[in-house]
Amino acid sequence: MDSTNLYSIDSVSALLFPVFKRYNVRKAILFGSIAKGTANASSDLDVLVDSNLRGMRFVGLLEDLQEAVHMDVDLLDVTRIQKGSPVAAEIQKTGVVIYEE
């Protein structure tokens, strides 16, 4: 990504769209510092996905997302989020849908 759009939700969404489509992700939500507009050079990309991916297919999605944006991605599956947890609260507060079938 060029540095002027490094942390733009629109630019991140555009880069990740083909990856989500290729892996048949049902929905993806961006949350955390990039979604809040407070990201810096050391920020990672926080993404929650709703998918049927498990095991190596999930790892493949993670690797392809990181390659697409050239930054670390913290990838979570919706089935792993506990209701009422701090992560669930962060997603509820800052989450932005960036992909949906």
Model regions: which residues?
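Catalytic core of pol beta-like nucleotidyltransferases
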Residues: M1-K27, K36-A41, N52-E101
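Acidic Asp/Glu-based divalent-cation binding sites
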Residues: D44-D46
